Amino acid sequence: MDMKNITDTLNDFSDGVNPFPVEWISEHPDKVEDVLAKLSTEDQIRYAMQLRGSLMHDFINLSPNSQEVIRGLPPEELYQMIKETGIGESLPILAMMSQNQLQYSFDLEWWQRDCFVPECALKWLEFIDACDDSSIVQWLQNEDFDQKVVLFQSLIKVYKDDEMTDSYEGVEEMEHLCLDGVYDVFFKTKEPGALRRLITLLRSEDPSLYTSILEAVIWYPVTQTIETAYRWRLIRTAERGIPDFKEAMEVYSYPSPEALKIPATKLEDFSYQGGFNIAPHYPLMQTESVPFLKDVVLRLGNSPRLNTISWELVYLANKIMVADQVQPSDLETRKESLKKVLGYINIGLELGASGDLEKGARLLSHTHVLPLFQTGYQQLMTLKWKTESFLKENGSFLERLFTELDKDLLAALVVRFPRVAEVGDKKALGWRHFSSIKDVRNAESFIDQWIFHLRFARKGLGLSERTIKQYLGKCDIHENHEMMDLTNWTAMAFAHYILFKKISCAPLSEPSAKSFLEIVFLLGVFKEEVRQCDSALVDSFKQELLKLPLAWIDSDQNFLATLLNKCVVHLQQEFGRIDLKAEVDWKFTHGLCIVKNPTSL
């Protein structure tokens, strides 16, 4: 199979339909309308799902049967589009959503775990207020009664002029509404315009429901009603692959060998009320960050398995958000959770397929993505536990050797979900989830490197917490002793070897430090150029270190070479431009531990 991109593969879902260049949506909307008029609703839905955010939104609005297209989309895909576009920009979409699609959005937006959030509910009501009335009326007439009561109890107070309900407590300065001379409605919000119109609309369209809700606001016990509404919410979300916390946490259990033998899912296994059983596309659109998984998916081609993989990814990302106790209504959280899912699956798939794409395609074609995710997760937990054990045994001494970057890199490996560093657009260090075996191997190598560094510092350089504290106590040039890390202590050992033919990290006098730099640096051609260290002297020092009784293995020698290279680069950057014939102001340098008084050595 020729390699292409994910969008090309998703195009195959529409039997090759790719009706116009994407640029036409903004540049030639009239041409898009003409093309869409000739396409079936199903093809329009499939093509819409290959787009993201505002492009998808604009495409749908150009369709002559946009309501059918909207209601044919899975609620997950539609909700993702609204989050990417912004709810304020999605009013035409909201106006045409079905009751089930609206409810899916409400279930994610109005609740934070088991807590109802009236501010979020009111925000959505205000946006829906700007749309057609029919959608919200349909929702009010069909949705679970307890949820409607919870909504109104959180936003209004209701009293009647009778002996049982005429207390009118705590309504001072609240806006008031009375539509029938019976129920006095007081608004808890400062700007109740949308809520006022909703109540007025409800009484106009369904007086019986209006009365039932206001009576329930008066009489239903708040706590029990919230609990009942939450139970119904859990039932609805469970049907869409969003389980309760206990079930969601099972995704982080140890993968069982039997799980790999469970047959792959079928489309019928996923809940969907639309007329076109089309899987969401947005998870597969994110696989650019996981090349191995992406290439495996491309090898699957246009197959039913691709549909079920998409659903599995959606359901798994939802479970992850529940298990991690994060808010699924936050767009960045949704992106992060999906990246984690894809990354862990990619690691598990790479391991299971031994890096072979064809083997990976065979594995993914009949294996649920969950055990692959769990395999990737366990790899990271093994890495985390190894790091924690290493830090627990050696933490206080390591603090004396780490750079700030080393501390950050190791700290990122012991958080709840280990992270890997990456350089952003502005060359600032950022953190992301592990996404490949290469990431894991690099992190393992980093830990192994520090295991060697620790052994080298203790047995090779003769350092301990006591000796470092003793040396720093004599070093009266640097105020910030934390700036002395393993690279600097290695430079000190290099200096002692060049000057005295011994391995030591004891502080140097100013004349000794100057003599070392005069010896180790080659003469420069130009005055302003950075002078280079004499590679012959560096190699001689390396050979001397290799004589140390450290039970050297190949990786140790590689780690030593890297450490010496860092040492040389640091010396050149810090001292390579200094005029050693003049007096050196050592307090503006960093890298050598120096004392002013030679008698203190």
Regions found by a protein language model. Name each.
Residues 2-96, 100-601:
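General marker for long, soluble alpha-helical cores
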